[in-house]
Every structure is written in structure tokens, then in C-alpha cells.
């Protein structure tokens, strides 16, 4: 029989791996964005996005831009493809994090 604790930790590992994939895809998107649309790159603070002095409001703008699918009108197909991928990874990572939280509550109640 599979241990519930081992299953929980496996789920946590999968969630962390997907977070790393999301982070990597976001960095790659910003590199593409710098080349194809410098104005949008500045609008979302692409240069300071991953720094300690990054502006959270501009970071949330990029998340909103991608989640609302406003990138579909963009002229660069590479940018559109990367945004689609990032949006899918964001939804997957959010769902996995929610599942980890529900599993944690379940484990606390179980034991």
C-alpha cells in the first residue's frame, strides 16, 4: 500500500518542479519580449522583474495581460506561443498548489 505521506511529498516535489518550469518560462518570455516589444517590456518592468526592487504592480500587470489573453493580438507568433505556454503552466501550477494545500489539510485532519 502506498503511504499517504509519501504521496503528499511526491505531490510537493511535482509542484516545486512545475514552479521552476513556470519561473524559467517567464524569464524566457521576458527575453523574447525585450526583442519584439520594448514598450511592453518597459510597461511590465522587464529589466527589474526578478530583482528585489521589482514593482509588484507591474508584475501583476503581466500576469493579468497573460491571463486575460490580451497577447492574441500581438504581431509576433513566437511571443504568442510563449504566452500560451506560460498561461497553461500558470493554471497548472496554481491547481497543483491548491491540491497541495487541500492535501496538507487532509493530512492534518487524518493524523
From Swiss-Prot:
Any one of the GO CC terms: plasma membrane
UniProt key word S-adenosyl-L-methionine: no
What membrane topology was assigned to this protein in its record?
Multi-pass membrane protein
Q: Which cysteines are joined by disulfide bonds?
A: none
- What keywords would UniProt list here? Cell inner membrane, Cell membrane, Membrane, Transmembrane, Transmembrane helix
Q: What InterPro entries does the database record attribute to this sequence?
A: Universal_stress_protein_B (IPR019598)
* UniProt-annotated location(s): Cell inner membrane
Q: Does the keyword Cell membrane apply?
A: yes
Q: Where are the transmembrane segments?
A: 1-21, 90-110
Instruction: Tell me which family the UniProt entry assigns to this protein.
Output: Belongs to the universal stress protein B family.
- Name under which the protein is recorded: Universal stress protein B
Amino acid at each position: 500500500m502506498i503511504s499517504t505521506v509519501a504521496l503528499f511529498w511526491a505531490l510537493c516535489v511535482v509542484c516545486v518542479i512545475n514552479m521552476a518550469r513556470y519561473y524559467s518560462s517567464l524569464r524566457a518570455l521576458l527575453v523574447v519580449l525585450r526583442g519584439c516589444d520594448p514598450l511592453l517590456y518597459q510597461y511590465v518592468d522587464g529589466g527589474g522583474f526578478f530583482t528585489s526592487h521589482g514593482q509588484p504592480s507591474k508584475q501583476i500587470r503581466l500576469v493579468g495581460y497573460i491571463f486575460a489573453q490580451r497577447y492574441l493580438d500581438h504581431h509576433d507568433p513566437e511571443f504568442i506561443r510563449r504566452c500560451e505556454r506560460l498561461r497553461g503552466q500558470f493554471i497548472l501550477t496554481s491547481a497543483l498548489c491548491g491540491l497541495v494545500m487541500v492535501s496538507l489539510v487532509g493530512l492534518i485532519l487524518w493524523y
